[in-house]
């Protein structure tokens, strides 16, 4: 049987970021007896017109893809120009490596507006995936556009996306078998009820709500653990004089992420701009963790959490839910069981991959 040739393309594509890991996981999980997978990526490059710094290539993600039979093809970009609407790549040799005629299908992961170099890829069928909200286009050779939540799809359609091309598939998050190792004994937290969250070091997405709520309910019997987080989280914890709050360095090592999750009783989410489809929330659900979050401009977290917890309006309501989780055992157990069920029925990576494989097969049929 002739293999389906598929190209993945991503600026900074071997970084340890959400969209990057999304594409890396899909590329890695495709059965290599049916698919020939090339992944085009570059290292991070400075932005013109913005002080944003894109995460750079992570050696562990390179090794991850190689170990799963993905052919990595590295190109170069000197700058990314955000002064242009299409965010052009400046001084790139991408076209020396890539020719769309060599592929049956192309998989993208991007923001949603017309972007370089995809504006110049006009023949080969594309499976697009959009990772921000409120932007959309109807490109003729896009076969389907994958959105990651109902809310995001609605905004994408309103911005010009073709509703007949839009499909919803959650983020594929790899959750390998993990042991019960945790930080509980190491931190002396055997008798504590532990809240926690996992977030990248980015002050632009910082929300004060989780720690503000924790300040209301903290005691000698509670703790809060943050994997990653920004300097704002650390400053808030210090300024409030919070008890039993600890921070772990950001990591891409899967065992350490699950060691962190094994330490928690409740996943206490908070992000100023909200979510589309959070990998961190999915990881929490895979550990059967009850969830708390708050309202924000994007509300994908509401769709993800469902009956595994609650999304509240502010820190006072957030604090009340924290108290309920601690003191109402029946409520806690109900949320815990629902978290496990949601993960198995909606977010398990094998069921998500079946949907992507079906899309690719449709393209070439």
Outline where the language-model segments fall:
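Donor nucleotide-sugar binding/catalytic pocket of nucleotide-sugar-dependent glycosyltransferases
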Residues: 133-135, 142-178
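A charged, aromatic-enriched C-terminal amphipathic alpha-helix characteristic of glycosyltransferases
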Residues: 330-361
């Amino acid at each position: 049987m002739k293999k389906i040739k598929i190209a993945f393309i991503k600026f900074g594509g071997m970084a340890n970021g959400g969209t990057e890991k999304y594409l890396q996981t899909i590329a890695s999980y495709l059965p290599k007896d049916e698919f020939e997978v090339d992944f085009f990526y570059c290292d991070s490059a400075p932005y013109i017109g913005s002080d944003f710094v894109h995460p750079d290539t992570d050696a562990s993600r390179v090794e991850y893809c190689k170990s799963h039979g993905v052919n990595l093809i590295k190109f170069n970009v000197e700058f990314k120009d955000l002064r242009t609407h299409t965010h052009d790549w400046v001084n790139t040799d991408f076209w020396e490596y890539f020719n769309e005629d060599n592929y049956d299908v192309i998989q993208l992961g991007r923001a949603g507006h017309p972007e370089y170099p995809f504006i110049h890829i006009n023949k080969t069928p594309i499976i697009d995936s959009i990772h921000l909200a409120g932007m959309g286009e109807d490109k003729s050779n896009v076969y389907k556009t994958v959105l990651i939540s109902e809310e995001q799809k609605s905004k994408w359609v309103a911005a010009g996306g073709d509703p007949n091309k839009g499909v919803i598939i959650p983020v594929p998050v790899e959750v390998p078998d993990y042991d019960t190792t945790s930080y509980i004994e190491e931190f002396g937290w055997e008798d504590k009820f532990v809240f926690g969250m996992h977030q990248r070091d980015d002050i632009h997405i910082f929300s004060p709500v989780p720690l503000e709520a924790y300040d209301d309910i903290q005691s000698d019997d509670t703790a809060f653990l943050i994997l990653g987080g920004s300097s704002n989280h650390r400053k808030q914890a210090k300024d409030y004089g919070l008890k039993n709050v600890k921070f772990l360095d950001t990591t891409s090592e899967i065992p350490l992420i699950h060691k962190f999750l094994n330490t928690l009783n409740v996943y206490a989410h908070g992000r100023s701009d909200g979510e589309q489809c959070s990998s961190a929330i999915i990881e929490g659900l895979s550990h059967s963790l009850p969830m708390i979050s708050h309202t924000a401009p994007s509300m994908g977290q509401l769709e993800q959490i469902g009956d595994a917890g609650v999304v509240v309006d502010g820190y006072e309501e957030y604090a009340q839910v924290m108290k309920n989780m601690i003191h109402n055992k029946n409520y806690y157990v109900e949320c815990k069981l629902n978290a496990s069920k949601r993960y198995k029925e909606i977010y398990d990576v094998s069921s998500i991959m079946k949907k992507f494989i079906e899309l690719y097969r449709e393209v070439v049929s």
